[in-house]
Amino acid sequence: MLLLRRLNRVRIASPYSVRLLSVKPISNVDDAKFRSQEEEDQSSYDQKTVCEALTCYSNDWQKALEFFNWVERESGFRHTTETFNRVIDILGKYFEFEISWALINRMIGNTESVPNHVTFRIVFKRYVTAHLVQEAIDAYDKLDDFNLRDETSFYNLVDALCEHKHVVEAEELCFGKNVIGNGFSVSNTKIHNLILRGWSKLGWWGKCKEYWKKMDTEGVTKDLFSYSIYMDIMCKSGKPWKAVKLYKEMKSRRMKLDVVAYNTVIRAIGASQGVEFGIRVFREMRERGCEPNVATHNTIIKLLCEDGRMRDAYRMLDEMPKRGCQPDSITYMCLFSRLEKPSEILSLFGRMIRSGVRPKMDTYVMLMRKFERWGFLQPVLYVWKTMKESGDTPDSAAYNAVIDALIQKGMLDMAREYEEEMIERGLSPRRRPELVEKSLDETLVCRE
C-alpha cells in the first residue's frame, strides 16, 4: 500500500514516543519532485484507505499509533470517528487504555470525530476482554459526559460481558441487587437473548436449557433471535436434531426466518441429516425471498467438504460471485482444511490473493502449520513472505508456526532470529529446548 510505503520514510525516536521525523531529500530537484508527488498522493488519503492501513498494524499498537499520527501530521488528513475507533480498538487490544482515553478526549469538540456508540462498545469490549469488568462498568457511568448513557450503550455493555464469558456479572448487572439505575426497563426480550447467548459462550448447556425454560416461566416473549440462539446452542451441544425440531416449531408458528436463522438451520440439518438436506433448505430460503449471504455459502461449502465432495465445493465457490456474494477468508479456510496436496493448497491460496480476498492471520497460521506437519519448509516461508508483503503484522501464533518449521529442518540460527524479532516486538515466544541449548553452547564457546 502507498501509505505503508510512505510511512517507511519516518522513524520513532523511542519506544514510547510517537513523534514523527521526516527524511529530507538531498537535492532541490528531488525535493520538488517529492513535494509534487506528495501533493498528488494526498488525494488518496481517504477514510477507507487509512482504516485499511491501520488494520495492517492490528498486531503492533506502536506502529498503528505511529501511523495514525503520521498520516495526520504529514498529509493534513483529518481523522474521522471511524479512524479514531479503529486505532482505539488496536490500543485496547494491548491494554493501552490510558492512551485510548486520551484519544477519546481528543475526539470531543470535532464534528468529524465525535465519540459514538461504537467508540464505547469498543471500550467495553476491550476492558471485558482484559477481565476488567468494573472498569467497563465505570466507563458506562462516564457516558453522561458524552450524552451516550442510554439504552443502546447499556445493551453494548451487557453484550460485551456476555460475549467474553462474564455472563454472571451481566446477569447481576441486569437483575441482581446492584442494578444500575438507567431509567429504562431491562426485563425485555433483547436482554434475555444476550444473556442466553452468554451462557452459550461459556458452553454451559444445562444452564442454557434452564434459562430457556426460565424465559417461559417469567413470560418473556421469545422472538426470532431467541430461537436462532437456542438452535445454535443445540447444534454446538451435539444435538442438531433438536435444532431441526425448533425449526419446525418456528414454521408452525409462521415465524418469518431471516438469513441468520436459516444459516443455523442449514448447519443443523446438514449435520443431522446430511448435506443434501442442507442444500434443500438453501433452495427453500431463496424461494421464500431470503437471499443467502457469505455465511450461508460458507456453511454449504463446509458441509460439502466434510462429505468429501470437493468438486461441488469448488463449484459453489465459482458460483458465489455470480450471485453477488463475494467469498471471504472463511470460505477459503473451509476448503484449505480439507485439501491434502501442497500444490492444490498453494494454487487455491494464489487464487485467493489474486481475487482480492485478504487472508486473516488465522489463515496464514493454518497454512503454515499444515505445511509444517507435512515437513515442507519452502511453502511455509512463501506464506510468511506473502503475509509480510500484504502489510500484515504477524502475531505470536504466526511467529511460533514459522519458528517450529525452521527447527524441524534444523535451521536453528534462522529460528533464533525470528525468536529475537518476536521479543523485540514485545511478544513472548514459547520455551524451546533446541534454542535454549544452542544459546548455552554459544555462551560456553565464548567463555573458552
From Swiss-Prot:
One of its GO terms (cellular component) is mitochondrion. Keywords: Mitochondrion, Repeat, Transit peptide. It comes from the Eukaryota. This is Pentatricopeptide repeat-containing protein At1g80550, mitochondrial. Its main location: mitochondrion. Pfam families: PPR (PF01535), PPR_2 (PF13041). It comes from Arabidopsis thaliana. The keyword Ligase does not apply. Residues 1-21 form a transit peptide. It is found in: Mitochondrion. PPR repeats lie at residues 80-110, 116-146, 150-186, 188-222, 223-257, 258-292, 293-327, 331-359, 360-394, 395-429. Belongs to the PPR family. P subfamily.
